[in-house]
Curated annotation (Swiss-Prot):
Residues 21-399 are extracellular. May be auto-phosphorylated on tyrosine residues. It catalyses: L-tyrosyl-[protein] + ATP = O-phospho-L-tyrosyl-[protein] + ADP + H(+). Its cofactor is Mg(2+). The chain crosses the membrane at residues 400-420. The gene is tor. This is Tyrosine-protein kinase receptor torso. The modification Phosphoserine is found at S608. It comes from the Eukaryota. Probable receptor tyrosine kinase which is required for determination of anterior and posterior terminal structures in the embryo. During postembryonic development, involved in the initiation of metamorphosis probably by inducing the production of ecdysone in response to prothoracicotropic hormone Ptth. Binding to Ptth stimulates activation of canonical MAPK signaling leading to ERK phosphorylation. One of its GO terms (cellular component) is plasma membrane. Residues 676-687 have a biased composition (Basic and acidic residues). Keywords: ATP-binding, Developmental protein, Glycoprotein, Kinase, Magnesium, Membrane, Metal-binding, Nucleotide-binding, Phosphoprotein, Receptor, Signal, Transferase, Transmembrane, Transmembrane helix, Tyrosine-protein kinase. Its main location: membrane.
Length: 923
């Protein structure tokens, strides 16, 4: 027994710790009476308060006085795991009080036995602690342990807390899982700062019960986009609850908590908690010593003019329930060099009369400031100065109403009734004509004007005509280009010009009509520019017959144009590989090399690779992992255009045209080639029912016998496209127009490769790709193209369009690639706030990527202007020592036109250069 006791004592001495809990490890010691006696003696020594835990244990080990008898009792202890890591398990022993009990928790020293469960053996370790918060260190990762706990008292009584409860450590390099819920417990005051309050936050453990957490918080009302505040929790005793201080009254905050693995810097997603801080007057009920008063309500100003520039003002406001200390009234004349008057008013005032004030300008401002010891609040009005001639006395005003205004109103009512009756009869006649028109067969190539007649509402009236207002029957509607939820777009001819006609669907609601008119007003206000899609005309006299005529761009959207270029390059690479393989086979046959098993194997591999490349070239219908899925095999009469709508087709009468009515997929693609002018007399000899158009650029040309080989895009061509977009956006910025949705899908391209920007400030309902996310209302937002300030504060400026232009450069460089290919729209905002941006794509020069990065600056004022972008892109084009294909074609067309118009030295009859006889495209 003496030897066993010495070994027991030696191990106690060897593993004594010095932390607050004074945990002591005793390895390879059995659970026996010696251990219980030493523990009881130690606890008895601690209760006397003469020595600390280490000294008591040492004294009991040498000269200890043991209790007379050990006895087991039943007590209300509970052991709970707090957290764990790869090498630690943290748990706490709590005294559970009865529902009616009030006795305090008894003093005890805890004995903890840890059995490590292994395949071939069982290792046991013993711990002693006078603290109920226990940390078991030095454990193996991903190991299981059975824990038994005893509570030992100084009188020799002990109780069993837990027996063989199983706990496990985490695996090495674990990935922290999703956080638990984060809740707001309460707001608490800050005694040292009465102008701020604090919030107590509580969160639940993560799924793996990790021990380390990070917390970030920021104010959503911040205008300078400050960095979020971060707090790291590394003390295991301070988990799951924290107080966020220095919160400003009446502000919005976001608090996020995540769990982290500090060994390899892995972390989980943030779990966010929005916090709405109460106002100062709600926290300190109407304490104007600490809080500013409410702003004055119902501020009104009545003015009278007796002499030129001399006014009398009667200013009134609502009397508040809780009065401020005083008011200050400020009156400002906005004219240069105008006067400023200031008045200090008593707290009981609710009105003030200014008998005479000189106002030189046409506008002036009135500000009423409510002041107290806690601050001030202001209400203001900007007013137009009334003229003396329009001011009448009350008696004259009554006479004016009785003898002039009332008779005029009666006359207007009679005229309105007469007009409504005449309009109702005209509408009924139109309805009868429309029913007859719907019964006739609809022809896609030519539509009679009666086919446009639809049912009109009785309460609709004609709008004021202007130079762009067109008659619906003067527009020849042809095939459908696309359709969306808002309406559909057809190809049409108006005054010998090819146009795109945007129509509303049958029975549009008020919101559709309003959005359609807003789109027309925007296009009219922007004006004409070579790189902006222009308006040709519109018809808005009846809501069921509204149409918008815009320029027709035959090559469709820039996005599809770039993706077709990407596919063309892939096919050319496959063809080149095929030719190289065939040439290698011919060379081997020409040299008449002796065939053996090795050469046979090489030829088989080459043939297999050739067939694989051909299959991939034929079946590849997608871009790459960075692009959205889209169909390349569909051939339509016109290229897809986002501004023209998509999906199913509906005619103007509302009948459905199935997709099988489209051109067959295997027909050759339409080649755009100008045709020579023919004799007009010969043209009109054909069938009168069939109309022939001279300009083949906008119509199907299925004869592919005389087709030109496709010219691949060069780097100079891509730079030319980007520069044209910058020129168009520069024009919009100079006219104070913010696009808000600049992307390749909203840029159109003509047959001569000229660029036209479309869909600026227009409706978004025709979009079908997953690049738009719902905003707070019914609108949608293009998340991956929006600037950081647009995502966080809904701020849209020309600088935010520059950010979108940088994303457009990424699309051009990658030939239609999807921005942020591996990031979902819901995660993008967090990454942008952390400073993440897209990496340089493959094949992109450093100069181009630097231009992209300058557009993505988090500070809007640090981004380049569109004028600067235009000049930088122009310099990059000159640096290539190459001329874009568009400029070459433009130069060749100009020279050809000059030669054709010069008939002095030619004996051949020349075609007249009168362009008005041709169908002219607007692009």
């Amino acid at each position: 027994m003496l030897i066993f006791y010495a070994k027991y004592a030696f191990i106690f001495w060897f593993f004594v710790g010095s932390n607050q809990g004074e945990m002591l490890l005793m390895d390879k010691i059995s659970h026996d009476k010696t251990l219980l006696n030493v523990t009881a003696c130690t606890q008895n020594c601690l209760e006397k308060g003469q020595m600390d835990f280490r000294s008591c244990l040492k004294d009991c080990r040498i000269n200890g006085t043991f209790p007379g008898a050990l006895r087991k009792v039943q007590e209300n202890y509970q052991m709970n795991m707090i957290c764990r890591t790869e090498s630690e398990i943290v748990f706490q022993i709590d005294w559970v009080q009865h529902s009616r009990g009030t006795e305090p928790a008894p003093n005890a020293t805890y004995i903890i036995r840890v059995d490590a469960v292994k395949d071939d053996n069982k290792e046991t370790a013993l711990y002693l602690s006078d603290d109920n918060f226990l940390i078991l260190p030095g454990l193996e990762s991903n190991s299981t342990h059975n824990i038994t706990a005893l509570a030992m008292h100084g009188d020799g009584s002990y109780s069993l807390i837990a027996k063989d409860q199983t706990f496990a450590t985490l695996i090495r390099g674990y990935q922290p899982s999703k956080m638990g819920a984060v809740n707001l417990l309460r707001f608490v005051p800050q005694p040292d700062d009465l102008h701020h309050i604090a919030a107590e936050i509580e969160w639940k453990p993560s799924a793996e019960s990790n021990c380390y957490f990070d917390m970030v918080s920021y104010s959503t009302n911040s205008v300078n986009m400050d960095e979020p505040l971060e707090v790291q929790f590394r003390d295991r005793k301070k988990l799951y609850r924290h107080t966020v201080d220095n919160l400003e009254f009446d502000k919005q905050y976001h608090v996020g908590v995540r769990t982290v693995n500090i060994m390899n810097r892995l972390e989980s997603d943030l779990q966010w908690l929005p916090i709405a801080v109460p106002s100062c007057l709600d926290w300190y009920p109407y304490n104007y010593t600490l809080c500013p008063p409410h702003k004055p309500e119902n501020l009104t100003v009545t003015q009278k003019q007796y002499l030129p520039n001399i006014l009398a003002l009667n200013i009134t406001w609502a009397r508040p329930r809780y009065l401020p200390d005083n008011y200050t009234l400020h009156i400002f004349d906005l004219f240069k060099g105008g006067t400023e008057l200031n008045y200090t008013l008593d707290q009981n005032r609710s009105h003030f009369y200014v008998p005479k004030i000189t106002v030189l300008g046409s506008h002036f401002e009135v500000h009423l400031v409510a002041q107290s010891a806690g601050g001030k609040n202001v209400s203001g009005l900007t007013l137009d100065k009334v003229h003396r001639g329009v001011l009448l006395s009350e008696g004259n005003m009554v006479k004016l109403v009785l003898f002039i205004i009332v008779p005029i109103c009666c006359i207007l009512m009679l005229c309105s009734l007469t007009f409504c009756r005449r309009n109702r009869s005209e509408v009924q006649a139109l309805q009868m004509d429309a029913k007859d028109a719907k019964a006739s067969e609809f022809h896609l190539s030519l539509m009679d004007s009666s086919g446009l007649l639809v049912t009109l509402s009785a309460n609709e009236s004609l709008e004021v005509m202007d130079e762009l207002e067109v008659e619906p029957h003067s527009v020849l509607l042809q095939d459908v280009l696309g359709e969306g939820a808002f309406g559909l777009v057809r190809r049409g001819v108006y005054k010998k010009r090819q146009v795109a006609v945007k129509l509303l669907k049958d029975e549009p609601n008020d919101e559709d009509v309003y959005a359609f008119k807003c789109e027309i007003q925007m296009l009219k206000a922007v004006g004409k520019h070579p790189n902006i899609v222009g308006i040709v005309g519109y018809s808005t006299r009846f809501s069921n017959q509204m149409m918008l005529l815009i320029e027709y761009c035959s090559l469709g959207s820039l996005q599809n144009f770039l993706r077709e270029e990407w596919k063309f390059r892939q096919e050319q690479n496959a063809i080149g590989l095929k030719k190289n393989l065939e040439q290698n086979v011919d060379n081997r046959r020409f040299n008449r090399l002796p065939r053996n098993s090795i050469h046979d194997r090489i030829e088989d591999i080459n043939n297999s690779m050739l067939s694989t490349v051909e299959e991939e070239s034929e079946s590849d219908q997608t871009h790459s992992s960075r692009c959205e899925t889209y169909t390349l095999t569909r051939i339509t009469n016109a290229a897809d255009n986002k501004g023209y709508g998509l999906e199913d087709i509906e005619n103007i009468g509302g009948s459905y045209i199935p997709k099988t009515a489209e051109a067959p997929k295997d027909r050759p693609k339409r080649k755009l080639k100008p045709q020579p002018k023919k004799d007009s007399k010969q043209d009109f000899k054909s069938d009168n029912k069939k109309r022939i158009f001279e300009n083949k650029e906008y119509f199907d040309c299925l004869d592919s016998s005389d087709t030109k080989p496709r010219i691949p895009l060069k780097y100079a061509d891509l730079l030319d496209i980007a520069q044209q977009v910058a020129v168009g956006m520069e024009f919009l910025a100079q006219n104070k127009v913010v696009h808000r949705d600049l992307a390749a899908r909203n840029v159109l391209i003509s047959v001569d490769r000229s660029i036209k920007i479309a869909d600026f400030g227009l409706s978004r309902d025709v979009y079908h790709e997953n690049v738009y996310r719902k905003s707070g209302g019914s609108g949608k937002l293009p998340i991956k193209w929006l600037a950081l300030e647009s995502l966080t504060h809904q701020v849209y400026t020309s600088q935010s369009d520059v950010w979108s232009f940088g994303v457009l450069l990424y699309e051009i460089t990658t030939l239609g690639g999807m921005p942020y290919p591996s990031v979902s729209p819901s995660d993008l905002l967090q990454l942008l706030r952390q400073g993440h941006r897209m990496k340089r794509p493959e094949g992109c020069t450093q100069e181009m990527f630097s231009l992209m990065e300058s557009c993505w600056s988090s500070v809007p004022s640090h981004r380049p202007t569109f004028s600067a972008l235009k000049h930088r892109l122009g310099g990059m084009i000159l640096a290539t020592n190459d001329v874009p294909e568009r400029l070459k074609q433009l130069q060749a067309a100009t020279e050809s036109k000059l030669k054709s118009c010069d008939g002095l030295n030619s004996k051949v009859e020349q075609v007249p250069c009168e362009e008005e006889l041709y169908l002219e495209p607007l692009n």
